[in-house]
Amino acid sequence: ADMIIERLGHSAQNDTQICYSREPSEALETGGGIHNALPLIKSDPFIVVNGDIWTDYNFANLHKPLPKLAHLVLVQNPDHNPKGDFSLRGSDVIANDTGHPSSLTFSGIGVYRAELFEKCTPGRFALAPLLHQAIAAGTVSGEMYSGRWMDVGSPVNLRAAQAKAEELIKSGS
């Protein structure tokens, strides 16, 4: 965390303010981390992007009204998650256990309303169970993204992404 703060400081280009939400010594996981950061988030809804993905997704696509509690960007299942996480029925995200034939993987890109986290207790908790509750209530929309996306959360996946990036640079893509 200190290296990120040292590198980026508290402002970026175009007078953007950067705020940091420090976690205690025990990592809070994604849900707990978002909940911990809510007092710093000035907009509702807000975008969350996992730090361990590589993508060319156009984030401007997320700048539209959000009628539900969450909107998830889903991708084709990578080798490390062949069964996927969720499915889509139109623009509604549904659970994989509904028998839907085409499961997809959560990309780590989502738009959320603070209301999704209202009943959560501060501390460590995963985002997935909270999303499953919201999906069961019909309050999560989604989209399927078919562009470039890779999970770089392991050394093997990071090396694969680096190789892909080098390949794209060489080809001029």
Regions found by a protein language model. Give the residues of each.
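Short, surface-exposed amphipathic charged segments that create phosphate/polyanion-binding patches used
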Residues: 33-36, 85-88, 156-160
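Short, conserved catalytic or adaptor-binding loops enriched in Gly and charged residues
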Residues: 9-14, 87-88, 133-135
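Residue-level signal for beta-strand positions within conserved beta-sheet cores that form or flank
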Residues: 14-16, 82, 138
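Conserved beta-strand segments of alpha/beta enzyme cores
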Residues: 17-19, 69, 139-141
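Catalytic-core segments of class I nucleotidyltransferases/pyrophosphorylases
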Residues: 47, 54, 59-64, 77-80, ...
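Basic phosphate/pyrophosphate-binding loop/patch that engages nucleotide-derived ligands
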Residues: 11, 39-45, 55-89
